[in-house]
């Protein structure tokens, strides 16, 4: 009976350690170590059984103490590296994450090289106004290799004999308001040019400096590159390609001492996402680019609903960018940065469902989470013998419901 009591309390103690560690990670919205959490749980259960079956009480207590020590060693954050004499190159600083990161790093004392598409744009003017003289603005379109090469020369000239510590790949592009079949080929090519080829160009160009400093590469990607969000085929495909490139690079640069991290944010208001004129322009461009046959099969009302859903979804996205910015800082300054960071609310539930539950559940979850379409394509209505009036009613219902539905569930794409 005494052995049973000891085993029971050992079990309770070790399980408390596991639950505490898991809750700590969940509250931090960081499930990058989700597989390690599962391993930790399995090891906990195994230790409990071994304690119950094989070990005397004294040894069982010793095992519990070792588990406690391992947990606190694992859970206690290590001190950050010093900021002094560290320079960072950031792409896509006209707005959004890039603009906010440039301001944050400059305020911390970094020397910042911030790229913008337009040196006279509002984003560049704002950075000049609020940042110190340590910040250097560079006009760079990352899809133009000549401009990227010139940015390298300008950066090296400004640094002199000093090192470049970090590269933050932030520049990205998302133009898509339709199904994969409806998306224009220019959207697919545009997303790949910026999100994949542009980022590859910048990374390869600056790698010699980063290898020399044994520095950091931090890349902003998206959960849509790992999960099939409806209506994001072109954007998601480009981010999927980017994820594989960055992961491959991480293995190859490990012998050089370069740490590579990927950040996967939830939904935030960045760029043109909350601009009604922007969505209207994309909608008209889509109508003009579709073939008459395809437009007839889907119907203009189907496209209109998709546009309205995207627009309403963007309105409810998170305006506070600090979770992503703080994660970028951690990836740059942590002695042992994580391979993947999940920045923002809602990602815990989404990744758990998509990683551990059956596809039938995860697919339905993604459909309900993102764009909840009610309007059916015209061709499907004819096949099923429904009335076209049903679509008109669905549009009205969806427009009334979409805002409340989106705000009731935290969004999980950037």
Swiss-Prot record:
Pathway: Steroid metabolism. InterPro entries: NAD(P)-bd_dom_sf, Sc_DH/Rdtase_CS, SDR_fam. One of its GO terms (cellular component) is membrane. Keywords: Lipid metabolism, Membrane, Oxidoreductase, Steroid metabolism, Transmembrane, Transmembrane helix. GO terms for biological process: cortisol metabolic process; glucocorticoid metabolic process; multicellular organismal response to stress. Residues 384-397 have a biased composition (Polar residues). Broadly expressed in peripheral (brain, gill, eye, heart, liver, head kidney, posterior kidney, and gut). Residues 382-414 are annotated as: Disordered. It comes from the Eukaryota. PROSITE patterns: ADH_SHORT. SUPFAM superfamilies: NAD(P)-binding Rossmann-fold domains (SSF51735). It is found in: Membrane. Catalyzes the conversion of biologically active 11beta-hydroxyglucocorticoids (11beta-hydroxysteroid) such as cortisol, to inactive 11-ketoglucocorticoids (11-oxosteroid) such as cortisone, in the presence of NAD(+). Cortisol is the primary glucocorticoid in teleosts and is released to increase glucose bioavailability in order to meet the increased energy demands in response to stress. Functions as a dehydrogenase (oxidase), thereby decreasing the concentration of active glucocorticoids, regulating the hypothalamus-pituitary-interrenal (HPI) axis function in adult fish. PANTHER family: 11-BETA-HYDROXYSTEROID DEHYDROGENASE TYPE 2, SHORT-CHAIN DEHYDROGENASE/REDUCTASE FAMILY 9C. This is 11-beta-hydroxysteroid dehydrogenase type 2. It comes from Danio rerio.
């Amino acid at each position: 009976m005494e052995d049973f009591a000891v085993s029971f309390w050992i079990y309770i103690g070790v399980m408390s350690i596991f639950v505490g560690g898991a809750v700590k990670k969940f509250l931090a919205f960081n499930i990058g170590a989700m597989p390690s959490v599962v391993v930790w749980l399995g090891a906990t259960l195994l230790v409990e059984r071994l304690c119950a079956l094989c070990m005397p009480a004294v040894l069982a207590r010793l095992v519990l103490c070792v588990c406690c020590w391992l947990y606190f060693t694992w859970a206690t954050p290590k001190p950050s590296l010093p900021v002094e004499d560290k320079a960072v190159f950031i792409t896509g600083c006209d707005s959004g994450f890039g603009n906010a990161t440039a301001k944050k790093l400059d305020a911390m004392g970094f020397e910042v090289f911030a790229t913008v598409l337009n040196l006279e744009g509002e984003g560049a003017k704002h950075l000049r106004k609020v940042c110190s003289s340590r910040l250097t603005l560079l006009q760079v379109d990352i899809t133009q290799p000549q401009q990227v090469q010139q940015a390298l020369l300008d950066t090296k000239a400004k640094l002199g004999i000093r090192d470049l510590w970090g590269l933050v790949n932030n520049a990205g592009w998302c133009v898509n308001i339709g199904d994969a079949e409806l998306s224009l080929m220019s959207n697919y090519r545009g997303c790949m040019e910026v999100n994949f080829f542009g980022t590859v160009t910048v990374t390869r160009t600056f790698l010699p400096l980063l290898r020399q400093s044994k520095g950091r590469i931090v890349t902003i990607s998206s959960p849509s590159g790992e999960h099939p969000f409806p209506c994001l085929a072109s954007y998601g495909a480009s981010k999927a390609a980017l994820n594989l490139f960055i992961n491959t690079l991480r293995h190859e640069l490990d012998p050089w001492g370069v740490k590579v991290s990927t950040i996967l944010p939830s939904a935030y208001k960045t760029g043109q996402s909350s601009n009604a004129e922007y969505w209207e322009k994309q909608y008209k461009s889509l109508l003009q680019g579709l073939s008459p046959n395809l437009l007839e099969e889907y119907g203009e009302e189907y496209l209109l609903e998709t546009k309205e859903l995207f627009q309403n979804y963007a309105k409810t996205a998170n305006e506070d960018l600090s979770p992503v910015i703080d994660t970028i800082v951690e990836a740059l300054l942590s002695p042992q940065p994580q391979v993947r960071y999940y920045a923002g609310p809602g990602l815990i539930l989404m990744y758990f469902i998509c990683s551990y539950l059956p596809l039938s559940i995860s697919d339905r979850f993604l459909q309900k989470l993102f764009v909840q379409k009610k309007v059916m394509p015209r061709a499907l209505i004819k096949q099923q013998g429904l009335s076209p009036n049903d679509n008109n009613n669905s549009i009205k219902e969806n427009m009334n419901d979409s805002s409340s539905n989106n705000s009731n569930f935290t969004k999980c794409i950037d």
